[in-house]
Amino acid sequence: MAYPFQLGLQDATSPIMEELMNFHDHTLMIVFLISTLVLYIISLMLTTKLTHTSTMDAQEVETIWTILPAVILILIALPSLRILYMMDEINNPALTVKTMGHQWYWSYEYTDYEDLCFDSYMIPTNDLKPGELRLLEVDNRVVLPMELPIRMLISSEDVLHSWAVPSLGLKTDAIPGRLNQATVTSNRPGLFYGQCSEICGSNHSFMPIVLEMVPLKYFENWSASMI
């Protein structure tokens, strides 16, 4: 999860987030090289005493500055498109969970089970226990099995919301009357925090999301106790 004065991304917990972090580093390297080249050319232009007032055109230079940006854009676009397709691909999910956004809480329904549904509200600051996180804890966590593909169906009952968990590389809009889907896969157990990422009203900041990823046998015990 995030911590104070953090400069980088949160630790990746899912294959998608690992791909996104690699793509971030790949794109940042390209941006750094371009910025260095541009600054170098600007410094040469400001310091050189050579001039070419009689030069009207330069076919070679124009060809280079047309082809080179096209190649750079392709190098950025190809891995980006690959990740987009990976994020939309859902193959044989082990579990389906429907998430509904409300002003200002989330409700969850495990569609593979009968009567396994609940609302998830933020715990007020005055009710927090020692060690719990302000504005991030909820009364009912979303318990999911780790190392299994899980399909999240996301929608809204009222206004636009956005269901986001950064460490899992998830951010899906919750739109009234529309059902969006996303895949959740965690490589390790733990608590993973997120928040509504679409301004949805006065209490937008008080819609946290907490996923509790556990081994499959613990999830089966939890689901049996909830039914």
Curated annotation (Swiss-Prot):
The modification Phosphotyrosine is found at residue 218. Residues 1-14, 88-227 are mitochondrial intermembrane. The chain crosses the membrane at residues 15-45, 60-87. It is found in: Mitochondrion inner membrane. Cu cation A1 binds at residues 161, 196, 200, 207. GO terms for cellular component: mitochondrial inner membrane; respiratory chain complex IV. SUPFAM superfamilies: Cupredoxins (SSF49503), Cytochrome c oxidase subunit II-like, transmembrane region (SSF81464). Its EC number is 7.1.1.9. It is an enzyme of class 7 (translocase). Component of the cytochrome c oxidase, the last enzyme in the mitochondrial electron transport chain which drives oxidative phosphorylation. The respiratory chain contains 3 multisubunit complexes succinate dehydrogenase (complex II, CII), ubiquinol-cytochrome c oxidoreductase (cytochrome b-c1 complex, complex III, CIII) and cytochrome c oxidase (complex IV, CIV), that cooperate to transfer electrons derived from NADH and succinate to molecular oxygen, creating an electrochemical gradient over the inner membrane that drives transmembrane transport and the ATP synthase. Component of the cytochrome c oxidase (complex IV, CIV), a multisubunit enzyme composed of 14 subunits. The complex is composed of a catalytic core of 3 subunits MT-CO1, MT-CO2 and MT-CO3, encoded in the mitochondrial DNA, and 11 supernumerary subunits COX4I, COX5A, COX5B, COX6A, COX6B, COX6C, COX7A, COX7B, COX7C, COX8 and NDUFA4, which are encoded in the nuclear genome. This is Cytochrome c oxidase subunit 2.
